[in-house]
Amino acid sequence: MAKLEDFIKAKEKLSKVLLETHLIYSPIFSKESGNKVFIKPENLQKTGSFKIRGAYNKISNLTDAEKKRGVIASSAGNQAQGVAYGAKESGIKAVIVMPKSTPLIKVESTKQYGAEVILHGDVYDDAYKKAKELEEKEGYVFVHPFNDEDVLDGQGTIALEILEELPETDIILVPIGGGGLISGIACAAKILKPEIKIIGVEPEGAASAYEAIKENKVVELKEANTIADGTAVKKIGDLNFEYIKKYVDEIITVSDYELMEAFLLLVEKHKIIAENSGILSVAATKKIKEKNKKVVSVISGGNIDVLMISSMINKGLIRRDRIFNFSVNIPDKPGELAKVVDLIAELGANVVKLEHNQFKNLSRFKDVELQVTVETNGSEHIKNLVQAFEEKGYEIIKIKSKVN
């Protein structure tokens, strides 16, 4: 098990490459959770995630002989950039094996840090096997993304920074993928402040740590199904399992829909864009039982595909009842469509989409179906809108307010 001096040494080494990520107080997540919530924005690191901490600490602890051999890693995202940047800053060779399906932007970002990129296989497991083959064949040093003591020590420096800036922290919420981040943070935090509570957060569709604790052994999930792809890990590290058992107080899960809602609030209220895995801890603030505590949520990364941003925002708006989809039957005669639009306008809602389908068969042959999407101010606004339609004699026949 790691000792305090291991984390302190790691912090000293990392001072050369880290951006100091100060805590950000969140009024919105504080209000919704009944606690004082602070955000630790690791998405602002140079490589876009916390991974540089563990990768650089691992590389800096290599012997001169090992550094001459160079390092190798397998990744489709944050680990690739962390290892590539860490190797560049240390002046050594880095080879990163990535699946062929890796988005071009991530491949190019990794290359920009000077790493040699090898595209191999269709999924991460294929890339991992190839990296291990090259480790054996070429003599590279493999940098594991989470199941490694030096990596764990690097990640744990986050806890040192949190407790230095906010010593009265009661709870730290940490995303869990393979388990390296929470292992380091939990160990360091408990050494410094034994009474602190550490809560791990996993996606519902990839809760490998939760299942491991429940079974009291490392288990492999049949599948990992979640939009939080960075934490879609079927099996946590065995080393990390021991740390989690000893230092983590609780593990909770959040749904993809809760992630969408948290994403929207981060963008709208904090102007922060983070990846789905990175916001697990923020999404979990509403699910903790404690009240009136000082809570720190670690945003672990911000490397999100730009094409996903609009989808996350739109689904978050639906989740918050800010977008309302419904269908209503109206008489098929001139002026009826205008009446509906005028009624919506009177109620202060904004039409986003309107589809007037005259050819859909209805039980009442003189009616047509009108499909409407409007922007609203929330649940109460929707309730008023539905009531107003009913008072005018319209029947809303299909309501799709939530995404769950």
What spans do the regions from the language model cover?
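PLP-dependent amino-acid enzyme catalytic core
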Residues: M1-N404
